[in-house]
């Protein structure tokens, strides 16, 4: 990879395909992690091969960029029915180690794609098989979970849509992947991380795209309802998604249905979404055929990324909104829930401590591959930081939990910057915000503003699950930990 940057100095000495002292051996077996009792019978099989391809991100008449993609398809979209038993084989066709993580999918822990913690790093030319029960309908995505700033920053991501036959029939549907790119005028990549960005809000790209284009013109019938699945797959940027020209309702967050919320009734008439977050919108097209525009309103220079224009007309307009079936998820027992609290911090000598796993822990002697750690620590959770630099030992879990127990977790942000916090392997209920800005909903990632405390609740599923900021530079420079659930 040629993504460069101060945060990942290992690129200076890692050659293509090189392994460091056998550190990418099989991840240790972990006691207490449940595996499926019944044989897994796949009903669908796919192979996803990571590789390079060219894409003209700067414009049709400008130089092309060598990006990363699965199966030479930018932001490849897979569609499968709810209930699918998916056998997904990841083939690493790039020149450094990688893994595949299916973001937001509730799955057996061994298929989560986190190197060292749940599986070995997949070396160039090697493969790894994931067995995934797709029981939750919605909009999900997949991406690497090592050197994410480099690999995802260069485009390595895809979309997984789990379809539900119970959904209402929309008159149109579109999938929109929002991503920025850090490009030089010749189409090459600028450094994807810089210390000034990694230690603050992140290193931003200036070339903004939706599905790899500057903007899109989409079609929907006049008077009809269009379902828009919007994914923020950027490494850094937080976006304020708004709609002009038509009625719009928020009908799902991170794939999970919620009672429709009119976008105009939310604070500032927008939905704020950080990296890795997804929303589904129901947009009712004007009966007179006038267009509807979608934009990111976070900056003064609004980025209008899509326009819905009328094509045809529905014969029997529906008032709407078109609600999705209620999410069928484990419901936390609030009367018996255990309570925990975690604080997001900027790392200083006083704020972050180094502690080790007990000597008898199966992961005590495991080392994280140098590819998967940053060079510098800037961030921490609860006075602990994920390893960086020469420290590559797996840290102790932030918490030990019990399978099947309900937990209420408070996430407090003591930093000056917002953080989209993601918990693997679970769908949690976002129950409360100290800023009183969020409707109650289920999600796998929640954006926590500076000075805010957000309360989430979930039923613990067995495994070793990471808990991290999804601004990728923040994660790779310390803001990641893990929960052990047995």
Segments (PLM) and residue ranges:
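N-terminal secretory signal peptides
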Residues: 1-8, 12, 19
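Short tyrosine-centred short linear motifs in exposed loops/low-complexity segments
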Residues: 83-84, 126, 134-140, 223-224, ...
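Active/binding-pocket-proximal capping segment
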Residues: 245-258, 414-443, 462, 472-476, ...
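Histidine- and aromatic-rich segments of cupredoxin/plastocyanin-like copper-binding domains
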Residues: 111-112, 116, 120-123, 191-334, ...
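Asparagine-centered strand-capping/turn motif at beta-strand->loop junctions
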Residues: 90-94, 231-233, 411-415
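N-terminal edge beta-strand
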Residues: 62-79, 206-217, 375-403
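Aromatic/His-enriched, Gly/Pro-containing loop or helix-boundary segments
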Residues: 70-71, 75-77, 109-139, 146-149, ...
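Extended terminal and domain-junction accessory segments
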Residues: 16, 22-25, 32-49, 152-184, ...
